Amino acid sequence: MAGKPVERPFSDILTSIRYWVIHSITVPALFIAGWLFVSTGLAYDVFGTPRPNEYFTEDRQEAPLITDRFNALEQVKKLSGN
């Protein structure tokens, strides 16, 4: 055996050039990807949330709340217009 494996000290990781080369690319890329995901409206489509202009319609100006947990499906159908 060559010896026990030892964890690398965190200060060594933070001061290494390799750490900053990798993270200076990935952190901004993740930020930009998240911003594009939300700003293009893809987040609304993926998670099924209504867009800000779809919360209130001409016919319904109150908040679309589900109030009866046992008849929730009927309320959702009524609120969505299906």
UniProtKB/Swiss-Prot annotation:
Which positions in this protein are listed as binding heme? 23
Pfam families under this entry?
Cytochrom_B559, Cytochrom_B559a
Topology of this chain in the membrane:
Single-pass membrane protein
Q: What is a single molecular function from GO for this protein?
A: iron ion binding
What cofactor is this protein dependent on?
A: heme b
> Where does the UniProt annotation locate this protein?
Plastid, Chloroplast thylakoid membrane
Q: Which GO terms describe its cellular component?
A: chloroplast thylakoid membrane; photosystem II reaction center
What InterPro entries has UniProt attached to this entry?
A: PSII_cyt_b559_asu, PSII_cyt_b559_asu_sf, PSII_cyt_b559_CS, PSII_cyt_b559_N, PSII_cytb559_asu_lum
- List UniProt keywords, sorted A-Z: Chloroplast, Electron transport, Heme, Iron, Membrane, Metal-binding, Photosynthesis, Photosystem II, Plastid, Thylakoid, Transmembrane, Transmembrane helix, Transport
From the record, give the transmembrane residue ranges. 21-35
Alphabetized PROSITE patterns for the sequence: CYTOCHROME_B559 (PS00537)
Does the record's keyword annotation contain Mitochondrion? no
Q: Which domain of life is it from?
A: Eukaryota
| Cofactor: binding comment | With its partner (PsbF) binds heme. PSII binds additional chlorophylls, carotenoids and specific lipids.
What GO terms describe the biological role, i.e. biological process, of this protein? photosynthetic electron transport chain
Assembly information from the UniProt record: Heterodimer of an alpha subunit and a beta subunit. PSII is composed of 1 copy each of membrane proteins PsbA, PsbB, PsbC, PsbD, PsbE, PsbF, PsbH, PsbI, PsbJ, PsbK, PsbL, PsbM, PsbT, PsbX, PsbY, PsbZ, Psb30/Ycf12, at least 3 peripheral proteins of the oxygen-evolving complex and a large number of cofactors. It forms dimeric complexes.
Function as written in the Swiss-Prot or TrEMBL entry: This b-type cytochrome is tightly associated with the reaction center of photosystem II (PSII). PSII is a light-driven water:plastoquinone oxidoreductase that uses light energy to abstract electrons from H(2)O, generating O(2) and a proton gradient subsequently used for ATP formation. It consists of a core antenna complex that captures photons, and an electron transfer chain that converts photonic excitation into a charge separation.
Kindly give the PANTHER family that the UniProt entry links to this protein.
Answer: CYTOCHROME B559 SUBUNIT BETA-RELATED
As for family, the record states:
Belongs to the PsbE/PsbF family.
- What is the designated name of this protein? Cytochrome b559 subunit alpha
Q: Which gene encodes it?
A: psbE
